[in-house]
Curated annotation (Swiss-Prot):
Enzyme class of the recorded protein, top EC level: transferase
Subcellular location: Cytoplasm
Name listed for the protein in its UniProt record: Transaldolase
GO biological process, one term: carbohydrate metabolic process
Main location: cytoplasm
Keywords: Cytoplasm, Pentose shunt, Schiff base, Transferase
Family to which the UniProt record says this protein belongs: Belongs to the transaldolase family. Type 1 subfamily.
Pathway the protein acts in: Carbohydrate degradation; pentose phosphate pathway; D-glyceraldehyde 3-phosphate and beta-D-fructose 6-phosphate from D-ribose 5-phosphate and D-xylulose 5-phosphate (non-oxidative stage): step 2/3
Assembly notes: Homodimer.
Catalyzed reactions per annotation: D-sedoheptulose 7-phosphate + D-glyceraldehyde 3-phosphate = D-erythrose 4-phosphate + beta-D-fructose 6-phosphate
GO MF, any single term: transaldolase activity
Classification via InterPro entries: Aldolase_TIM, TAL/FSA, Transaldolase_1, Transaldolase_AS
PANTHER family in the cross-refs: TRANSALDOLASE (PTHR10683:SF18)
Amino acid sequence: MSTKLEQLRALTTVVADTGDIEAISKYQPEDATTNPSLILKAAQIAEYAPLIDASIAYAKAQSNDKTQQVADTCDMLAVNIGKEILKVVPGRISTEVDARLSYDTEGSVIKARQLIKMYNDAGITNDRILIKLASTWEGIRAAEVLEKEGINCNLTLLFSFAQARACAEAGVFLISPFVGRIMDWYKAKEGRDFESSEDPGVVSVTGIYDYYKTYGYNTVVMGASFRNIGEILELAGCDRLTISPNLLQELEDATGEVVEKLIDTNGTKERPAAMTHAEFLWEHNQDPMAVEKLADGIRNFAVDQGKLEVMIAERL
């Protein structure tokens, strides 16, 4: 019998959640996703030293100001890692905007355009890139602007139904609803483990997927942040799933039937009126888990971005 990873590929587009090119080459995913934490981790791999050196050289050619050099190096490093990943995946790379811009629509748009220009200057076309933004109201509005410019976006740190609905209404290309981090919160709060089928993260993504398909939204649903393969298999059939190398290996080693759990109903139900800012904030803030995890996620990405900047500054 074929492995569970092979069977999953037949139902869902498998994406690698890593900046490790060796791991990506091994599992042959369609796409790959990175974030500030993964870029920091990748930057500490010895084989990536030439990419850091090239990024520093680029930054020094752009400016004599050290602060600007650090910022430019970080951006170019993310792009350089993305370029290497695109040599081994046929699809797209997701590159994230600085998390400290999560509440700054204009700043996010400017940073996204800069990243896209860096890719374009290296010969990478827009159809191979997704710009990652936090699913704040401001991030969603930035994505709305960028999508109209032909820059596709991946809205991440998505924990509430309100975030998912607002993303669809803004016409974003793809969302990354988090599974494991939702489960973590409920596990800590309730002090118990969950069967995969009743995992709160799985339930959340299933609800979002069904809503999108009922109303005919084209936004791609890509489940993310998995803690075990049970969560992944409960979402078989989802548009895309982004999976860490260790869980890809578990799926590669596992046999047994993979059953399609999420099915596209191709619905055309009349859509509700788009949410206002006030409605979004009210609905999102009714979910204490989502409020806590969104803020926590932004903080943690910002911390890792800061660590990367310190590391780069020491090498300038």
